Amino acid sequence: PVNEAGVERLFRALVGRGCPADCPNTCDSSNECSPNFPG
């Protein structure tokens, strides 16, 4: 099973910088809001 909290924390650490204001911690590598994470 996936540890969602751990995955989200890693995701934020990797791509959480330079994201749009409406989803500053949940964007993908293109700085778009990621549909796979709550934002």
Curated annotation (Swiss-Prot):
Pro-segment residues? 1-16
Q: Which domain of life is it from?
A: Eukaryota
Major location, coarse class?
Answer: secreted
Query: Which Cys-Cys disulfides exist here?
Result: none
Please give one Gene Ontology molecular function term for this protein. Answer: toxin activity
Q: Which cell locations does it reside in?
A: Secreted
Asked if Glycoprotein is a keyword of the record, the answer is no
Briefly state the modifications made to the protein after translation: Contains 2 disulfide bonds.
Q: Which UniProt keywords apply?
A: Amidation, Disulfide bond, Neurotoxin, Secreted, Toxin
Could you tell me which residues carry Proline amide? 38
Write out the tissue specificity statement of the associated record: Expressed by the venom duct.
Q: Does the keyword Secreted apply?
A: yes
Record's GO cellular component terms: extracellular region
Q: What is known of its domains?
A: The cysteine framework is XIV (C-C-C-C).
Q: By what name is this protein known?
A: Conotoxin Cl14.5
Which species does this protein come from?
Californiconus californicus (California cone)
